[in-house]
C-alpha cells in the first residue's frame, strides 16, 4: 500500500478533479434544480469571483513597475541567470500579494461570495480553483485576460 501512495499523490497533482458517474432516478423537479444550480448559480458565483480577480489583475498589469519586472524576468530567463531570475521572481510575487492576485485571496473572496449564493463549499472551492487556473494562465503563461462564462457554457 505504501508504494502506491506516491503514485496517488502524483495522479492527484496532475488531475484537477475526480469524476464519479452514478445512475440515479431523479424526478423532473430535482433535475430542474440541478440544472439551475449548475447553469445559473455556480456560473454567476464564478463570474463574480472572476470580476474581482480580473480587476485586481488588470490593476497589477497596468503598473509600469510590474511590466518592467516581466521584461527583466524574460531577459534573465533567456540568459539563464538564476540569481537574477529568483530576485525578480520574488519581487513580482511581492507585487502580486500587494495587488491581491494570490490563490489565498481568490479562495477568501469565494468564501465571501459564497455567503451570498449559499453554495456547497465543495462547489465553491471548485469554482475558485477554476478561476485561479485562469489567473495563473495570465500570470505565468501566455494568457492575456480572464474571461467570464456565458449562459450554457461548460
Language-model features: locations:
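Nucleic-acid substrate recognition interfaces
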Residues: 1-154
Amino acid at each position: 500500500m505504501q508504494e502506491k501512495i506516491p503514485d496517488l499523490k502524483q495522479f492527484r497533482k496532475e488531475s484537477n478533479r475526480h469524476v464519479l458517474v452514478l445512475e440515479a432516478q431523479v424526478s423532473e423537479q430535482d433535475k430542474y434544480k440541478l440544472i439551475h444550480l449548475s447553469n445559473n448559480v455556480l456560473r454567476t458565483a464564478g463570474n463574480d469571483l472572476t470580476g474581482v480577480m480580473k480587476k485586481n489583475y488588470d490593476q497589477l498589469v497596468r503598473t509600469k513597475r510590474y511590466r518592467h519586472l516581466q521584461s527583466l524576468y524574460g531577459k534573465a530567463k533567456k540568459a539563464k541567470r538564476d540569481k537574477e531570475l529568483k530576485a525578480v521572481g520574488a519581487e513580482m510575487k511581492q507585487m502580486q500579494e500587494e495587488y491581491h492576485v494570490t490563490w489565498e485571496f481568490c479562495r477568501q473572496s469565494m468564501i465571501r461570495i459564497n455567503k451570498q449564493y449559499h453554495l456547497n463549499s465543495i462547489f465553491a472551492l471548485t469554482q475558485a480553483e477554476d478561476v485561479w487556473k485562469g489567473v495563473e494562465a495570465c500570470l505565468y503563461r501566455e494568457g492575456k485576460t480572464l474571461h467570464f462564462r456565458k449562459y450554457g457554457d461548460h
